[in-house]
From Swiss-Prot:
The gene is flgC. The basal body constitutes a major portion of the flagellar organelle and consists of four rings (L,P,S, and M) mounted on a central rod. The rod consists of about 26 subunits of FlgG in the distal portion, and FlgB, FlgC and FlgF are thought to build up the proximal portion of the rod with about 6 subunits each. Disulfide bonds: none annotated. It comes from Salmonella typhimurium (strain LT2 / SGSC1412 / ATCC 700720). Pfam families: Flg_bb_rod, Flg_bbr_C. The keyword Nucleotidyltransferase does not apply. Keywords: Bacterial flagellum. The keyword tRNA processing does not apply. Belongs to the flagella basal body rod proteins family. It is found in: Bacterial flagellum basal body. One of its GO terms (cellular component) is bacterial-type flagellum. GO terms for biological process: bacterial-type flagellum-dependent swarming motility. This is Flagellar basal-body rod protein FlgC.
Length: 134
């Protein structure tokens, strides 16, 4: 594998982790959004990754295959005075797991940093290669 391919692979990982961070930020921002444009509570999103290898290659980068809605049920919070409460006094809240989203945020951030380090290492190797003949 050529060193230049590493830039493509690490770059794809940076883009994928950036998308993961954006989705986690959106989930956290909407953790208390009781209603959305459709009148329903916000539904947490999840990023699905897949390998992005060139045909015939065993290795490759990563790409975002899709962003899907979490199938976890909405949380029910007892607030009988809330105008959005049902007949039993429960309000449907988003299915966002705040702790899980914080873990996703930290994991994506660490992965992003690791791929930056890969890029810096390859850059350093290429610069050292250029100075070998001196």
């Amino acid at each position: 594998m050529a060193l230049l391919n590493i830039f493509d692979i690490a770059g794809s990982a940076l883009a994928a982790q950036s998308k993961r961070l954006n989705v986690a930020a959106s989930n956290l921002a909407n953790a208390d959004s009781v209603t959305g444009p459709d009148g329903q509570p916000y539904r947490a999103k999840q990023v699905v990754f897949q390998v992005d290898a060139a045909p015939g290659q065993a290795t490759g980068g990563v790409k975002v295959a899709s962003v899907i809605e979490s199938q976890a049920p909405e949380k029910l919070v007892y607030e009988p005075g809330n105008p959005l409460a049902d007949a039993n006094g429960y309000v449907k809240m988003p299915n966002v797991d705040v702790v899980g989203e914080m873990v996703n945020t930290m994991s994506a951030s660490r992965s992003y940093q690791a791929n930056i380090e890969v890029l810096n290492t390859v850059k350093s190797m290429m610069l050292k290669t250029l100075t070998l003949g001196q």
